[in-house]
Amino acid sequence: VNILIVGKMNKSDELFSAFSMLSKKDREAFLLKIKYVEEERQAEKKEPSILTPEKVQNNRFANDFFCPHCESRHIVRYGKRPDGTQRFRCVDCRRIFQATTNTVLGKNTYRNQEKLRMYVNCMCKELSVRQSAKICGITVPTAFAWRHKILNALRNTCEHQMLSGTVELDRTFFNLSFKGSRHASEFKQLIEKYDKNKESLQQVCVPLAVGREGGFTGKVSTLGWSSTDTILSAIKDHLTSRSKLLADAEISQNNQNGKVLRNVNLTTVKGINEDRSLDAVRKFKQGINESINLKFRGVATKYINDYILWYGFLHLSKQKPKECENLLYDIALYSICSVNTRSIGKQMMPIKLSSGQKMLLSEFLDGLAENTMND
C-alpha cells in the first residue's frame, strides 16, 4: 500500500506559487514594489544627522553668501556668538544675521529639528493641523504657524516655474472664505446660481496650468467669472515663447489673448484627441478640489495659492515620496521664509477686483462691521 503524505505549504511556498502564476508584467511590477519597500526600510534605519551651525551654514550658503534680508551678495563676517555660531553683516542694508536667519524655525532650528522632521512627514501625508500637532507634540497654533512658514518657504523656492511646450489650461472655483478670521468667518455662504455675466462675491476663480514637460501653476485671479484675458494674465509669467496652450471652448471662446500674450498660441480642444486632451490639468483640478474641500474642509481664500502649490509639489513631482519629504525638509531648513508668526494671519487676499466687485465687497464689509458692533 502506497501512502502519500501531503504536508502543509508554508507561507513562502504559497507566495512563490502565487508569484509564478502572475504574468511577466505583473512579476516585474511586484519586484519593483519589493525593491521600493526595501529602500524605504533602509532609509528609515538610517539615523538622521544632527544639525550643527557649520552644517547649516555650509548647506544654506553652498553657492555663495547672501543676505536673507535684501539678498545682497556683499557680505562680511561679523564675529561669533558665545556658542560659536558665525555672524555676518550685509554691507548694503547693514543688518546682522546668521545661517538660520529668516528660516522656518530661525534660532530654534537646532532645538526643534526632530519635531520639524516629524512635522514635514505629516505635511507629506497631508494631515490636518490638529493631527500634526498631536503627533509632533506641539500646540495647534504652533502647528498652524509651522505649516504656513513651510508653505511660504516652498513658495519662495518653487513658485517661479516656467512652462514650455504643450501646456494644458483650465480653471476651477472655490467659495470665498474667511476661515480663521475672528469676525469675517461669520459670513454665511449663500447658494448662488453660477452666472458668467454676474458680478459675484460668492466664488473666486483659480486658473490652473500643467505643462506636459513638467511644472504647474495655479493662482487666484478674481471673484466670479473670469475672462480669457484675466486667466492668461494670471499665468503669463510662467509661459515662454515655446508654450502652446490647450484650453476648452468655454475658456477660449472670447479669446483676445493677443492683447495679453503675443507669442503664445492658444488652441481650443474639441472632441477626443490624445494630442489635445486635457487629462493632466483636469486630474490636477479634481485632486485640488478634493484636497481643499474634503480633506481640509475649506481653506481661507488668502491661503489658497499656497495650498495649490503644496498639492502640486506632492502629486505632480516626478520624485519618490521619500525624496519629496527630504526636499521639503531641506526647504524648511535652508530656504528663505518671509513671514513670521504674527504676520501669517495678516496676509491679503490675492484677488483682482472689478469696480463693481469693489463696491459690493465694501458694502459687505461695512455691514459686517456694523453687525459686529451691535453684537
At which residue positions do the language-model features occur?
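Residue-level recognition of single "structural anchor" positions
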Residues: 1-375
